[in-house]
Structure formats: C-alpha cells, structure tokens
C-alpha cells in the first residue's frame, strides 16, 4: 500500500485496482502483431491432412515425399539399424560437433558425390561442410552467394522446381529468375527450350540444376543433353549450383546419378553441390546433409571454408550429431556400405517397378492415352499430366490424394493398390 500512497504506482499494480487500466494494458500487450496475416497452408501438408480425415478404406496418399515399402509403411534401412547398433555399442559422448560438422562424414560425402578418384579430392580444392539436410545445404549455399558472389544476385531456377527452392533463395536475398525445363505437351524435358533460355542468361549468373530425379517432374536430361547444357554453361560462364537430393535413389546407381555433377567438373566448370541423406538412407528426421564448394585451388578452398563457418555460426552454431554418425558409419564401413548400396537399389527398383505396373494396369483398363512418360520419368515423383479438375475428381470420387498439379509420389504406390489407382485414373481421363 505504501507504493499507492506514495504516488509512484507501478503500472501492473495500478491495473489490478482499476479495471479500465487493466483493459488498456491488455490491449497494448496484444497489439504488437495485429498486422500479421495468416499465412497460406503448405500444399503438401494440406494433402496429408485431408487424407487423414478421409474414412475410405481404399484411400491413397500420393503427396508424401518419403519412401514407403510395398505395404505402404515407413521403411528403416537394415544398414541404418546395424550402424545404430554399432554406434550404441561404442558408448560415445554427446559433445558438440565442430561448426563444419563431423569430419569423417564430410570427407565421405564428398567422395560419394565426386567419386573416390576425383581430381578435386586429390588436389584438395574443395570444401565440404555438414548441413541440416538438403534444405540447410541450399540455405548455406544461397547465403554464401548473397554475401560473396559479386557478379549477380540472379539465380535461375528450372520451371517448375522444388517448391522450397523459391523461398530459400528469396529469403537469402537472391533475385529469382527462371528457365524452361518441363514440356507439358510431352510430359518430358523441354531440351530445346532449356538450352535456348540458358544460352540467353547473362554471363556470370547462377544456374540451379537438379543433379538427378528432378523434383517435382521426375524428368531428367539424358547424358548427351547434359553435355550440351554443360557446353552452354561453360560458354556463358555461369555458376552451376547443383541440388542432389536423390543420389542412388533415382536409378539405383550412385555413380550414374552423380554423372552430371562429375561431368561439369571434368569440363572445368567449378560448381557447388547440395546433398541430402533423407531419401537414400531414409534419415528424414535426422536432418543429414552436406554442402560442397569446388574451388580453384586448395588455398581458395580454405578461405571459402572459413567464411562458410562464419555463416553457419549465427544460424545454428553446429549441426546435429546422431545422423552424421549413422551416415559416416555406413559410408566408411565396407560391409555396411555394400549392404546400403544394395538396399538403395531395392528401393529404386521398387519405384521403377511401380511405374511399369501402373502403365500396364492403365492399358488393362482400356486407356488409349500414351502413358510412356510415367516410365520415362525417374525417381520418387511423377508428373502424371493430369489436369486440376481430374485431380479433384480423384480426390472426391476415389479418395486418391495428390497435389493439384498432378504430381504423385510413386513411393506411395504398392502392388496392392496400383490396380485401384489405374482404374481411378482411367475413369477421370477417358
């Protein structure tokens, strides 16, 4: 009460005795964020939420970007389980990793991407840092470009591209441009359009390329097309920014999936590269990735590494430990690595097999459309060519969920539901 009598009344105490003051204080406290608008829902998560609410026993979720086994269940690779057991038996500590991550993981990641006999590795003219999966690698790379790529702020993305590419580069301060990639008429690669657009990109700009299993289309250039693209990139003196989220998971052969990256480097094109172990090791929730910059020489690589660490420090200080240990154990233990490569091929082959079965079942349904693009495309995702109104019918009439652009995750297709999917697609396209 002394405070009240003194005339020096604290606001909170005064509000307790005067309801009007309390209301005013409450209004002031709640007024900071009244201008913040509700953000749009994530299109992929929206598909999943609608799927969960559906009670149809035949419902299918073809929107999820994660591998499923032939029973439609999440799959933990046996090689991952073995690696976890080996790590647990060592009773290791939980100390912080260095800013750049687990050294043995970074070295093995670079070898996996560039090849064990790569000249880049032998000369030491590269730097690899551990990142928070592929998304983190992209953001680190984009932030480095924003700070040090003095030639241009423009980054050219394929049309279409993974939805997260746009906000990652935009939020890092880069200017977004595009180049033709997908041809809706053929549901394939618009090679002529892509080369024409790339050849007109201003010199010393950044060009984003999907190394393999293009997301969302599943459409990849053939090796001879990659060669022509590399020739144009070199002629225009463009900086090639590779996103490789599916090495091994696309074709079942890690070397084949990394061919484009290695070819560009062999042609004297210095690139940067983002890797993810979410798909090819099934380490989705562990957030395991890497960012590699190929440099002019070892001295330049050391300077780039120092600046990458300066970028990482205020973002998240250092990367997670557990997933990197798992990936490193698999990559650096010969028997585990051999087992893992076999398991990756099994996953890739299952997806390839589902594509073939889907086309076969569409023919059995009597469909007269050309569905060859389904088997021509590669990787987890398939651009079906379905129109938005056809997708809407699939959702409403058959409880088959996918994004409005007709993209499906082939990983969600199994031998037990592929016939139902083919029947439904035929019904909405005949």
From Swiss-Prot:
Induction: Up-regulated by long-time exposure to alcohol.
Record PTM Phosphothreonine, positions in chain: 48, 333
Biophysicochemical property: temperature dependence: Optimum temperature is 47.5 degrees Celsius.
Subcellular location: Mitochondrion matrix; Cell membrane
Cofactor(s) it depends on: pyridoxal 5'-phosphate
Modified residues (N6-acetyllysine): 59, 73, 82, 90, 107, 122, 159, 185, 234, 279, 296, 302, 309, 338, 345, 363-364, 387, 396, 404
Modification Phosphotyrosine occurs at: 96
Gene3D superfamilies referenced in this protein's UniProt entry, alphabetically: Aspartate Aminotransferase, domain 1, Type I PLP-dependent aspartate aminotransferase-like (Major domain)
SUPFAM superfamilies listed in its UniProt record: PLP-dependent transferases (SSF53383)
Protein name: Aspartate aminotransferase, mitochondrial
List of residues binding substrate: 65, 162, 215, 407
PTM sites of type Asymmetric dimethylarginine: 313
GO molecular function: kynurenine-oxoglutarate transaminase activity; L-aspartate:2-oxoglutarate aminotransferase activity; pyridoxal phosphate binding; RNA binding
Superkingdom of origin organism: Eukaryota
Enzyme class: transferase
Keyword set, alphabetical order: Acetylation, Aminotransferase, Cell membrane, Disease variant, Epilepsy, Lipid transport, Membrane, Methylation, Mitochondrion, Nitration, Phosphoprotein, Pyridoxal phosphate, Transferase, Transit peptide, Transport
Biological processes annotated in GO: 2-oxoglutarate metabolic process; 4-hydroxyproline catabolic process; aspartate biosynthetic process; aspartate catabolic process; aspartate metabolic process; fatty acid transport; glutamate catabolic process to aspartate; glutamate metabolic process
Gene Ontology CC entries for this record: extracellular exosome; mitochondrial matrix; mitochondrion; plasma membrane
Entry's disease: Developmental and epileptic encephalopathy 82: A form of epileptic encephalopathy, a heterogeneous group of severe early-onset epilepsies characterized by refractory seizures, neurodevelopmental impairment, and poor prognosis. Development is normal prior to seizure onset, after which cognitive and motor delays become apparent. DEE82 is an autosomal recessive metabolic encephalopathy characterized by epilepsy from the first year of life, global developmental delay, hypotonia and feeding difficulties apparent soon after birth, and intellectual and motor disabilities.
Enzyme Commission numbers on file: 2.6.1.1, 2.6.1.7
Record's function text: Catalyzes the irreversible transamination of the L-tryptophan metabolite L-kynurenine to form kynurenic acid (KA). As a member of the malate-aspartate shuttle, it has a key role in the intracellular NAD(H) redox balance. Is important for metabolite exchange between mitochondria and cytosol, and for amino acid metabolism. Facilitates cellular uptake of long-chain free fatty acids.
Residues with the N6-succinyllysine modification: 73, 90, 107, 122, 159, 185, 227, 296, 309, 338, 363, 396, 404
